[in-house]
Amino acid sequence: MRPEDLARLSVAELRTRLLDRGEALGDACEAALEADPRAGAREVLRLVRKRRRENRAEGQRLRHLLRYEAELWERGLVHVAGVDEAGMAPLAGPVVAGACVLPRDYRPRGIDDSKQLDRAERERLAEDIKRNAVCWAVARAEVEEIDRLNVYWAGMLALRRAVDGLSARPEHLLVDARKLPDLPFPQTPIVHGDALSLTIAAASILAKTARDALMAELDLAHPGYGFARHKGYPTAEHFDALGRLGACPIHRRSFAPVRVALGLEPAQGDLFALAEAAVAEDD
């Protein structure tokens, strides 16, 4: 686009070409728009510059999220996998884990720890990750396994199943906060990894969206508890339903609030203290 062309374009056309299509704008064209007597044209320029700043900041953020992956890529590794789980704290439903290997040039705009995203953003990113990943997998540990093993080790089982489900064998695994036992390849545990590694963040999004969809299905099979809304987490609505209806087959009977609803003594105690102790042992 030449500077002399700008004056012949309406403000609506400028918006379409520069904002909707993202056509490049050279220095001379920027200067021409800055001097354009039309306030609307100058506003288009302001928005172009704002988007440029945001894109630059997003690029820096994504590079920061890829620092663990970049170090491994520089060593010649290709299949760097990330894995994370969702659903450790709920009173009902399985633990679900996601795993993925991403292409080196993949930069999904807006990716973050799944807990920091709204549902629409998570679902958009999950579909984008599935389309672009070298490979991905979702797996779970069922309620019966949670009750038999305790939730920490059931979570480890779900993580391992997700990793084993990848069609490409990982050369290195990035894990959120813990180490998986007996893996045949190296791994790096990263505390708060879903906020510090792009690949773990992608895995967390796969896990969270898969579990949310499953809990919506289970809500139809077990009406009255509100599983589609609270996803099995210990909310006031969920406690009220437990009091009225008692426990259903997908409730974790080793969790204290469920056992109380059934008139049983607590069994697992402080599961997250147990999990922290196990992580400390791994370290």
Curated annotation (Swiss-Prot):
The UniProt catalytic activity note for this protein reads: Endonucleolytic cleavage to 5'-phosphomonoester
Q: Which GO molecular-function terms appear in the entry?
A: manganese ion binding; RNA binding; RNA-DNA hybrid ribonuclease activity
Task: Report the Pfam families cross-referenced here.
Answer: RNase_HII (PF01351)
UniProt keywords, alphabetically: Cytoplasm, Endonuclease, Hydrolase, Manganese, Metal-binding, Nuclease
UniProt keyword annotation of Manganese present: yes
- CDD domains, sorted: RNase_HII_bacteria_HII_like
Q: Where in the cell is it found?
A: Cytoplasm
Cofactor remark from the record: Manganese or magnesium. Binds 1 divalent metal ion per monomer in the absence of substrate. May bind a second metal ion after substrate binding.
A Gene Ontology CC term for this entry?
Answer: cytoplasm
Q: Name one GO biological process term.
A: mismatch repair
EC no. given is 3.1.26.4
Q: Which principal EC class is assigned to this enzyme? A: hydrolase
RNase H type-2 domain location: 78-267
What does the record give as cofactor?
A: Mn(2+); Mg(2+)
Give the UniProt family note.
Belongs to the RNase HII family.
Function, as annotated, reads: Endonuclease that specifically degrades the RNA of RNA-DNA hybrids.
Tell me what this protein is called. Answer: Ribonuclease HII
Q: Which organism is it from?
A: Anaeromyxobacter dehalogenans (strain 2CP-C)
What gene is it encoded by? rnhB
